[in-house]
Amino acid sequence: MTILINALGIVILLGALYLLSSNKKDINKKLIIKALLIQFVVAFLLVKFPLGRIALQKVSDVVTNVLSYGKEGLGFLFGPLADAGAPTGMIFAIQVLGNIIFISALVGALYYLGIIGFIVKIIGGAIGSVLGTSKVESFVAVANMFLGQTESPILVAKYLKDMSQSEIMLVLISGMGSMSATVLMGYAGMGIPMEYLLIGGALVPLGSIVVSKMILPEVVPSLADQDLQDDLAQAEAAASKEVKIDNKGDNANLIAAISQGANDGLNMALGIGASLIAIISLVALVNGLLGVFGISLEQILSYVFAPIGFLMGLPKQDILTASQLLGSKLVLNEFIAFGQLGPMLSGLSYRSGLMMAISLCGFANISSMGICISGISVFCPEKRNVLAKLAFKGMLGGFLVSVLSSLVVGLIIAI
């Protein structure tokens, strides 16, 4: 029964994407099927194939070890306050948010040295060749395995002005459906296994292509609609270019790149901290008001998103929990949801815990729309109106990317 419900969930999700589609007749069914099949293969290799699981665990250990070096800088600056084992216990602002500064600096260095760009170009080129997506959008989709929603477009900033609306939609969906490497240790610090996060990140490019190319597929030229012809012309122009990934940005040298990365990390940590203070306090206020009626915001969200929890094929006792977490992620943010999931994992099965974690991977929430519009339009002001027009569907698409990845992994485990 679990397998049937899980499979039904994938079918219903694809049906929902079809209903959301702006150009139903132009959906490239061959592309969608190919991307889905490859996503299933990747999921199988990571969660069922013995060598794949061993490799994933090794990579997870390496990533965790590398990212943990941020504790050295935090220990120097904050002393025992940076040690979770000290009498002061866990101090989220220091031990979780503080580590973002180191990771952001590391990403800045890898980005400047061209290491991230090289990986993106290899994997993105392979995906583009197999699926027929343009080089630009393939690179951006893959870049979101490592970079955030406003960071990945930097790689191809000079091509943004030539991108079609379908390609812009993929930029939005892959951005909001992904995680940045800079926050991985933050999630891990809340009790989420790095292995779970890496699986979720690996499935982002293919899931983003499936979702975006159903919601807004590339258009077919029509003599009756000049706008469609213009959109197609822009897509062909962007696809025909030899895409050169920009690694240097505005940085003069490696030291400047590291410094810029650290500053970006500080701003990100401050932004996340400010959001958490505001959101947690406001939720407490709302729950205080709702308490008069004997309900809470968490209970409301659990029932609103219950159909998704059911279609994930989870045990009955886990459905409302998963639904409430999904609601918290979409309405509030993923940090709140991961913070709630972490303490629960020990009481969940491997399948339930992994599915819930993957479903929360990604930046898709209400505030992300504004972040994407303002962040990406800095590189391409002429696309601001297009970004604003597509942002809401982009957010829903990013949310559904994580749900689709969760359903795919859940089905692989259940079979």
Residue spans for each PLM region:
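Structural signature of hydrophobic alpha-helical transmembrane segments
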Residues: 1-11, 95, 295-299, 356-368
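Alpha-helical membrane segments and immediately flanking helix-loop junctions
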Residues: 130-189, 204, 322-408
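Intrinsically disordered, low-complexity non-transmembrane regions of multi-pass membrane transporters
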Residues: 1, 61-62, 72-81, 217-265
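Hydrophobic alpha-helical hairpins/lids featuring a short glycine-rich hinge
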Residues: 69-133
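Transmembrane helical segments that form the transport core of multi-pass membrane transport proteins
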Residues: 263-346
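Hydrophobic core segments of alpha-helical transmembrane domains in multi-pass membrane transport
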Residues: 10-21, 35-47, 100-109, 177, ...
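N-terminal alpha-helical transmembrane segments of multi-pass membrane transport
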Residues: 1-93, 256-259, 263, 272-284, ...
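Juxtamembrane and boundary regions of transmembrane helices in multi-pass small-molecule transporters
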Residues: 161, 185-243, 380, 385, ...
